[in-house]
């Protein structure tokens, strides 16, 4: 039952999926943390895998960069393959001065400069929010592991290279914790099709201070976030 962008067979995906942007990161997660792994899709090199974590069937697949790419895959995964829980795992740039590099942010809501949710909501402003059950599961997992997390609004940008850096001042004033490029679209798709979605990101760099993590630091922090998220996933 291939779709235009996914060539997996029916039943290839688990109900719960980790959803990083980078397909090679999806491959890394599958090979590092899952058992009994099978690659189930590879259209346009957007790799997807299904395996088990502590006995529970889990899938992981790349979403690509930006809301349009993420929305295409999320739509087909939910609508055509029956995925019910999509957890984006990725990185973001911090805005607020009290958010530090290597912090883990849970996107309770996602502001955006994209018009996609207005298009699906008859021109009105749709509140793109995470699913409470998914969010609570990850928060509880973080508590058990002693992982420091921040919970709040993030911003999903259409442009990586913004022409208006003054917008960062507005974001900070409004309490936005970090900037990424997918969550608002993912949340909109999930609400449209009756699925559950959450965005969990690590701070890889600070837009205000210019501080960045090293490759080694990014990997260590990312691994901690993935384990925390997988531990939450097996409770769903």
From Swiss-Prot:
GO terms for molecular function: purine-nucleoside phosphorylase activity. It holds the Pfam family PNP_UDP_1. It catalyses: a purine D-ribonucleoside + phosphate = a purine nucleobase + alpha-D-ribose 1-phosphate; a purine 2'-deoxy-D-ribonucleoside + phosphate = a purine nucleobase + 2-deoxy-alpha-D-ribose 1-phosphate. Its EC number is 2.4.2.1. The keyword Glycosyltransferase applies. It is an enzyme of class 2 (transferase). PANTHER family: PURINE NUCLEOSIDE PHOSPHORYLASE DEOD-TYPE (PTHR43691:SF2), URIDINE PHOSPHORYLASE (PTHR43691). Belongs to the PNP/UDP phosphorylase family. This is Purine nucleoside phosphorylase DeoD-type. It comes from Shewanella baltica (strain OS223).
């Amino acid at each position: 039952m291939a779709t235009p962008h996914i060539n997996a067979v029916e039943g290839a995906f688990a109900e719960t999926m980790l959803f990083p942007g980078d397909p090679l990161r999806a491959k890394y997660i599958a090979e590092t943390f899952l058992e009994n792994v099978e690659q189930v899709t590879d259209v346009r090199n957007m790799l997807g895998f299904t395996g088990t974590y502590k006995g529970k069937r889990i899938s992981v697949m790349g979403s690509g960069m930006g809301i349009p790419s993420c929305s295409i895959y999320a739509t087909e995964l939910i609508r055509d393959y029956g995925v019910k829980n999509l957890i984006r795992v990725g990185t973001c740039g911090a805005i607020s001065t009290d958010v530090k590099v290597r912090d883990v942010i849970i996107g309770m809501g996602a502001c955006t400069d994209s018009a996609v949710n207005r298009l699906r909501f008859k021109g009105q402003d749709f509140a793109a929010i995470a699913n409470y059950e998914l969010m609570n599961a990850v928060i509880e997992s973080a508590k058990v592991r002693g992982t420091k997390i921040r919970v709040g609004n993030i911003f999903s940008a259409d442009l990586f290279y913004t022409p208006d850096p003054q917008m960062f001042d507005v974001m900070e004033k409004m309490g936005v914790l970090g900037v990424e490029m997918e969550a608002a679209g993912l949340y909109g798709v999930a609400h449209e099709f009756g699925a559950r979605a959450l965005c969990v990101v690590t701070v890889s760099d600070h837009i205000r201070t210019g501080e960045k993590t090293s490759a080694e630091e990014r990997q260590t922090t990312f691994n901690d976030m993935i384990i925390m998220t997988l531990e939450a996933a097996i409770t769903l």
